From Swiss-Prot:
Native source species: Allorhizobium ampelinum (strain ATCC BAA-846 / DSM 112012 / S4) (Agrobacterium vitis (strain S4))
Gene: nuoI
Residues in 4Fe-4S ferredoxin-type domain copies: 53-83, 94-123
NCBIfam families associated with the record: NuoI, PRK05888.1-4, PRK05888.1-5
Subunit details: NDH-1 is composed of 14 different subunits. Subunits NuoA, H, J, K, L, M, N constitute the membrane sector of the complex.
Protein name per the record: NADH-quinone oxidoreductase subunit I
Amino acid sequence: MASVSQAVRSLFLKEFVNAFFLSMRYFFKQKATVNYPFEKGPVSPRFRGEHALRRYPNGEERCIACKLCEAICPAQAITIEAGPRRNDGTRRTVRYDIDMVKCIYCGFCQEACPVDAIVEGPNFEFSTESREELYFDKAKLLANGDRWEREIARNLAQDAPYR
């Protein structure tokens, strides 16, 4: 009896028809993926991407060389050298380096910063061809901040009620 049932199923190609209808059902549904890099999905305001140093609206850099980000970094990826105190009593960094090879994108540096100087921006497309390009110095970090400032400020404003 089992062989007759199997012969009938194979004669009418039941498995093929079931598979075909299953494929057609998914063919007409909305796609679950995007055609990256031509389309990009939504990015959360809390996304932790490429690091950036921010400036005040008058152009002065925000970092006050408190070194809290360097102290809290679990990967020890941040190196800061502070310059001498200025006449008004504030300090600024002479050297601010981040080794992105070591960085684990935990966001502790951003949370520790009292003036929101170091942030993890919205950029997730920063592939490189050499390892040396992943050592960010102060100039590169400030350039990232200048490039992404509008989006960074918007993301921080959206996240402000939860901080």
